[in-house]
């Protein structure tokens, strides 16, 4: 299993603060029952980072209002 590092995610979201916001927002969504966009059996925080590193989600999710 490949390990996800912050450097992998920083290639997609260069600002560390935006990266943290996007990862925590997505992890919260996953823990509330949203479907993951990548195949994983990890906890929501790791899954969120995997999605960011894969380019499945990005900072555009911070601009959306949950509905």
UniProtKB/Swiss-Prot annotation:
Name the chemical reaction catalysed here. Answer: RNA(n) + a ribonucleoside 5'-triphosphate = RNA(n+1) + diphosphate
Q: What keywords sit in the KW lines?
A: DNA-directed RNA polymerase, Nucleotidyltransferase, Transcription, Transferase
Q: Name one GO biological process term.
A: DNA-templated transcription
Keyword Hydrolase present in the record's keywords: the answer is no
**One GO molecular-function entry:** DNA-directed RNA polymerase activity
GO CC, alphabetical: DNA-directed RNA polymerase complex
- Do you know which InterPro entries this protein is assigned to? DNA-dir_RNA_pol_omega, Pol_omega/Rpo6/RPB6, RPB6/omega-like_sf
- Tell whether Isomerase is among the UniProt keywords: no
Instruction: State the Pfam families in the record.
Output: RNA_pol_Rpb6
EC? 2.7.7.6
Could you give the subunit structure recorded for this chain?
The RNAP catalytic core consists of 2 alpha, 1 beta, 1 beta' and 1 omega subunit. When a sigma factor is associated with the core the holoenzyme is formed, which can initiate transcription.
Q: What does this protein do?
A: Promotes RNA polymerase assembly. Latches the N- and C-terminal regions of the beta' subunit thereby facilitating its interaction with the beta and alpha subunits.
Q: State the similarity comment.
A: Belongs to the RNA polymerase subunit omega family.
**What PANTHER family does UniProt report for this protein, alphabetically?**
DNA-DIRECTED RNA POLYMERASE SUBUNIT OMEGA
Q: Know the name of this protein?
A: DNA-directed RNA polymerase subunit omega
Annotated source species: Leptothrix cholodnii (strain ATCC 51168 / LMG 8142 / SP-6) (Leptothrix discophora (strain SP-6))
């Amino acid at each position: 299993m490949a390990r996800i590092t912050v450097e992998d995610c920083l290639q997609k979201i260069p600002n560390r603060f935006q990266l943290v916001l996007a990862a925590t927002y997505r992890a919260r969504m996953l823990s509330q029952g949203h479907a993951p966009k990548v195949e994983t059996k990890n906890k929501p925080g790791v899954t969120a980072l995997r999605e960011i590193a894969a380019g499945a989600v990005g900072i555009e999710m911070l601009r959306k209002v949950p509905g």
